């Protein structure tokens, strides 16, 4: 009996100690008035908690204008419902932490190469949690293009993590996350769950990471990628992204902010009225919508043991699998996916030779990929499915099973490319072969195939692939060249069998 009482007393003491390890940012001077810069108070709370061995840094309801928040190991940063963290506008010589010094990035852009110029950042940490029902407003963050990319005091990411372990980010809501809402580079054991992200560029960038679980996230990113895996050379070494599971997520490309307010605004049907900034060039472009699930483009390292399942894509891009810089993309399974009103290629593979890697890096590979149980309705017809390698470098061992693709149709072979260039070094996207949206007064330029374009492939199985069109389209269903060892079972066009290539 005495032993039992002693154990209970010890447990109670432990519980009280755990309860006591809460550091309220208001106790450290945070005003929460939306005007006063509260990051010094938040950082003071984090520093105190870290010095005490860890604990919860508690952000109660209120509006917290902030510059860079410096995370620490063994810290749980918790935002109560009603807490709004506002990325403050740099002014009067004050602003966010400067990007850490280092050599000019050779193989990836500035945004991928720095972490401290962020609203929240951590380097070399472990046991970090950021959670709660709070709201993170990054409206004053840089989109990562233009003249302010490298200016001190300007931040271009909401959360940036480098070489951290045991990370949990859950249940928060984000608006306008900058160039990256999350950039995680070289992170091991990370859980991203229950996040709502309505952002202007990339939402979740998972770069050179291992053992990652992404689940139950709502992601809207009209001008760039939704959930994207990368394997850049940002750490100065080759590193794969591997053992990643993505499940139960909704991806879209509606106008920024319109998912959070539940209006789901589409771009006008006339593409000329949709001026936007091309995130890769900084120039004005005419845009319908973006967002997608993607492996690449940065691919000095590879992608291994990846599973994507039970996700929806709406009014956005599709599924993109790319090896451009020498990485090996292999052992990937994608299943139980629905798409509606998607605006470029529903399924896009590209093995290319951009080679943004150290000199002498060989061309990469794409092999052992299974895509199954995909239903796509009312996809734009300009691009179709595209699966392409380059001369002498084949996409290999791919199975596409039980996939239904419905296209808008209404295109004409008069607008199609007469020949499709190799473009082995071009940026990999469905328009990379010379396609374009309509220029005012001119027709679009589209792919010669209305259903699927295949080139430089070895060993591919189509088992239950079904095409249908909402309007007539007089282009060839499938255009292929240099394709070896193809198996076609139960491939149909408008319910009628397609016998072969």
Roles of regions detected by a PLM:
Residues 7-17:
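Bacterial N-terminal signal peptides
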Residues 19-501:
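Extracellular/periplasmic carbohydrate-active domains that bind, remodel
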Residues 1-4:
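Positively charged n-region of N-terminal signal peptides that target proteins for export
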């Amino acid at each position: 009996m005495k032993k039992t009482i002693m154990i209970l007393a010890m447990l109670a003491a432990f519980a009280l100690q755990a309860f006591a390890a809460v550091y309220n940012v208001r106790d450290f001077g945070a005003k929460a008035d939306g005007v006063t810069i509260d990051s010094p108070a938040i950082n003071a709370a984090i520093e105190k908690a870290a010095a005490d061995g860890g604990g919860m840094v508690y952000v109660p309801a209120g509006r917290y204008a902030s510059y860079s928040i410096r995370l620490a190991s063994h810290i749980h940063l918790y935002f109560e419902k009603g807490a709004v963290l506002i990325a403050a506008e740099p002014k009067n010589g004050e602003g966010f932490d400067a990007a850490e010094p280092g050599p000019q990035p050779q193989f990836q852009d500035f945004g991928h190469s720095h972490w401290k110029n962020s609203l929240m950042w951590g380097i070399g940490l472990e046991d970090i949690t950021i959670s709660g029902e709070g709201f993170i407003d990054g409206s004053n963050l840089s989109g990562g293009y233009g003249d302010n990319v490298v200016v001190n005091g300007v931040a271009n990411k909401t959360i940036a993590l480098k070489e951290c372990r045991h990370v949990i980010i859950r249940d928060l809501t984000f608006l306008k996350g900058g160039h990256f809402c999350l950039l995680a580079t070289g992170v091991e054991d990370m859980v991203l769950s229950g996040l709502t992200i309505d952002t202007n560029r990339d939402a979740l960038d998972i770069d050179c990471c291992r053992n990652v679980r992404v689940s139950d996230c709502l992601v809207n990113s009209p001008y760039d990628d939704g959930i994207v895996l990368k394997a850049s050379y940002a750490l100065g070494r080759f590193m794969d992204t591997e053992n990643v599971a993505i499940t139960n997520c909704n991806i879209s490309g509606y106008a920024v902010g319109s998912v959070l307010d539940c209006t789901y605004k589409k771009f006008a049907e006339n593409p000329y009225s949709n001026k936007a900034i091309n995130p890769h060039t900084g120039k004005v472009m005419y845009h319908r919508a973006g967002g997608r699930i993607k492996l690449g483009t940065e691919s000095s390292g590879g992608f291994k043991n990846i599973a994507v399942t039970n996700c929806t894509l709406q009014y956005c891009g599709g599924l993109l699998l790319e090896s451009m810089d020498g990485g090996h993309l292999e052992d990937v399974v994608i299943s139980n996916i629905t798409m509606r009103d998607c605006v470029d290629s529903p399924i896009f593979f590209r093995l290319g030779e951009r080679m943004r890697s150290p000199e002498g890096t060989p061309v990469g590979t794409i092999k052992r990929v299974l895509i199954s149980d995909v239903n796509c309705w009312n996809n734009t017809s300009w691009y179709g499915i595209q699966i392409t390698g380059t001369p002498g470098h084949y996409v290999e061992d791919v199975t596409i099973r039980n996939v239904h693709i419905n296209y808008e149709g209404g295109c004409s072979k008069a607008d199609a490319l007469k020949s499709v260039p190799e473009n082995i070094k071009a940026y990999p996207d469905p328009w990379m072969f010379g396609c374009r949206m309509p220029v005012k007064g001119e027709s679009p330029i589209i792919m010669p195939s209305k259903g699927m374009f295949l080139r430089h492939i070895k060993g591919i199985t189509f088992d239950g692939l079904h095409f249908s069109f909402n309007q007539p389209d007089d282009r060839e269903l499938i255009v292929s060249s240099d394709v070896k060892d193809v198996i076609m079972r139960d491939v149909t066009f408008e319910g009628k069998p397609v016998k072969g290539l």
